[in-house]
Amino acid sequence: MKNVLILGGPGNISESTIRYFLEKKVPVGVLTHATTDLLGLDGKISVFRGDRNDIEDLMRVYREFDPEVIIDFCCFEPFQAKVVVEAVKQMHCARYIFVSTVDVYGYPLSRLPMRESDPWGEPNCLYAKNKKECEQIFKEGFADTSTSLTIARPAYSMGKTFALSAFERNRGKHIVARIREGKPVYVPGDGNALLQTGSAYNTGLMIARIAENDNCRDQDYTCGHDRLNTQDEYIKAFANVLGMPVKIVHIPTDFMYSLERKEVEDSILKDLSIHNIYFSVEKFKQEFPDFVWEYSMEDAARAFIEHQDKIGTFDKPLEEQFEDKVLEKWEKAMEALRQEIDF
């Protein structure tokens, strides 16, 4: 296999993709605008500074690096897809891997576990809507060209730089901080909703295997963990890694919506957290029966905590979030109610 060009990164998922190809002695180039952390890959990859939204930058990198395969980890908006299609048509690249998202299937899912071929619902957030439109732009743009398209749709992939809370996509660090401080952690509903937490390390390897296998041309694959967990188990994974107890407080989602607060409306509760999240990876397993999901959910939580400690995320107390303030008032109200119920 000749050169592999990564658009974006090195990041949460793409790091293990890059390391996989480096171990196989495949040259890897990365087009990035980042000027700092390369996650320990300094000197091991060809780094091209530039803007993936600029067709001239894309063409410059193509001429210098001559990739056989391009893996796009950072296409989030339709205009970005259009720029890439125009550039790749001039490049004549053999394969293009678009990293989309399982959110394009729409929630609630039409089937559990959700397969690639099952009926899709409408996207319920702008992120998913844009990714779905990008998929269509790539499909139409690469039709009848020499470039074959493969779509990889990662499920939730926790890793060094990314962990969800039930309320926001970037608040995993607040879960860690609250457990360390002995504070309760909010979980919606009764905590038994399915989440299917995966490791970014595993997901990155799945994408690498797809990118090197010609059988995957013109296909789409869900990339996620092969096991399930509940939302309560997700929080407990952080506590287990920290070696500390955690108090989980369940608050009904209907109550959260009844507050009619912008913070709730803008949260991921409606988009994600109140639904059962369960995707089939059987299509991937049929193509790669030897694949091993090496990292567990706790391994992923450990990678997140260790990296965030390393970069100083927890050096200063984290600001209390909206859901934490609601949780505190909920606890007081529930205690008052317990005292009222005396019969």
Question: Each PLM stretch: what is its role?
Answer:
Residues 4-24:
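N-terminal Rossmann NAD(P)H-binding glycine-rich loop of SDR-like oxidoreductase domains
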Residues 35-93, 98, 106, 111-113:
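NAD(P)H-binding glycine-rich loop region in Rossmannoid oxidoreductase-like domains
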Residues 101-126, 140-145, 167:
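Active-site "gating" loop of Rossmann-like NAD(P)-dependent oxidoreductase/epimerase domains
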Residues 137-164:
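Conserved beta-loop-beta element that borders a ligand/cofactor-binding pocket
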Residues 167-175, 188-211, 218-219:
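Substrate-positioning beta->alpha
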Residues 187-193, 221-228, 239, 272-273, ...:
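Glycine-rich Rossmann NAD(P)(H)-binding loop
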Residues 200, 258-291, 310-314:
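Conserved C-terminal active-site "lid" loop/helix of NAD(P)H-dependent oxidoreductases
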Residues 209-269, 303, 314-343:
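Mid/C-terminal beta-alpha module of Rossmann-like enzyme folds, strongest
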